[in-house]
């Protein structure tokens, strides 16, 4: 489901990837969280890739619409 949501936000003409941020678990960062703009992400198998960083899907904490503040995904 998460991979499908990200693909939809990246490729569906109704959505603009520049409007979304993905927050993920990153040990050592402030609050162990880091955020990256969706527009910088490439999907490979079970990972998100950006700037040579690989983030497994299970580390994704939240996907937020930056314009509206709507949370599209939040890890339980």
Curated annotation (Swiss-Prot):
Family assignment? Belongs to the UPF0248 family.
Q: Which domain of life is it from?
A: Archaea
Question: What protein am I looking at?
Answer: UPF0248 protein MmarC7_1289
Q: Which InterPro entries match?
A: MJ1316, UPF0248
Q: What is the lineage of its organism?
A: Archaea, Methanobacteriati, Methanobacteriota, Methanomada group, Methanococci
One Pfam family per UniProt: MJ1316
């Amino acid at each position: 489901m998460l991979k499908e949501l990200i693909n939809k936000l990246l490729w569906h003409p109704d959505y603009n990837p520049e409007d979304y941020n993905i927050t993920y678990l990153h040990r050592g960062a402030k609050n162990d969280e880091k955020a990256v703009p969706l527009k910088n992400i490439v999907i490979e198998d079970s990972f998100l890739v950006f700037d040579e960083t690989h983030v497994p899907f299970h580390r994704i904490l939240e996907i937020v619409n930056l314009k509206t503040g709507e949370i599209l995904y939040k890890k339980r």
